[in-house]
Regions:
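Alpha-helical transmembrane segments and immediately adjacent membrane-interfacial amphipathic helices
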Residues: 2-24, 51-112, 135, 140-166
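Membrane-interface helix-loop junction between the first two transmembrane segments
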Residues: 20-43
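Short, Lys/Arg-enriched, Gly/Pro-containing loop segments at transmembrane-helix junctions
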Residues: 31-32, 108-117
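Short membrane-interface loop/juxtamembrane segments of multi-pass integral membrane proteins
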Residues: 35-51, 116-145
Length: 166
């Protein structure tokens, strides 16, 4: 149990630090959107950046919840506190995923219009993950896939925590 708890503490710390870094980058992108060349897309993209920032902040909180649950397990406490921690994390992740999916559905509906799709494909944004400029359209697609995979992985971590504590 000690090895599992220590592994979970390290995992939670890595999740917390990486997600906090991504939240900071998304927050900075929110500030730079006034410099975009397509004025019609600014409000839409600023809202997406804000939701993106909140999304990574939620995952940073989930990292802290993993640490809290692991410390609770390490102290040989009963399984009930870990179950409550996991339940609150699942609730956070569910709300976050729903908001993220609604936002991306709006992007899809707007992005289907040919005039905007052409501009989105030609509009270049700096992407820290690729360390160069990529099309806004490509970036939105990749972010949606990666973030949903991250939601599923974090939900599975809390499922494992719940099983261990019972």
């Amino acid at each position: 149990m000690t090895f599992i708890s220590i592994t979970l503490i390290v995992t939670g710390l890595l999740i917390f630090l990486s997600q906090l870094s991504y939240a900071r980058i998304a927050g900075e992108m929110y500030g730079y959107r006034d410099q975009m060349t397509v004025p019609r897309l600014r409000p839409l993209q600023k809202r997406a950046d804000l939701i993106h920032c909140v999304h990574h902040s939620v995952h940073a909180v989930c990292g802290l919840l993993i640490i809290l649950a692991a410390i609770t397990l390490l102290r040989q406490a009963s399984g009930m506190p870990v179950i409550w921690i996991s339940a609150s994390a699942w609730l956070l992740l569910a709300v976050d995923t729903i908001i993220y999916l609604i936002n991306n559905k709006k992007h899809d509906l707007i992005g289907r219009r040919d005039d905007i799709k052409r501009k989105w494909k030609s509009e270049k944004v700096f992407c820290p993950e690729h360390d160069n400029e990529v099309s806004l359209f490509r970036t939105l697609r990749e972010l949606t896939t990666k973030n949903l995979i991250r939601d599923i992985i974090h939900a599975l971590v809390f499922a494992v925590l719940t099983l261990i504590s019972v």
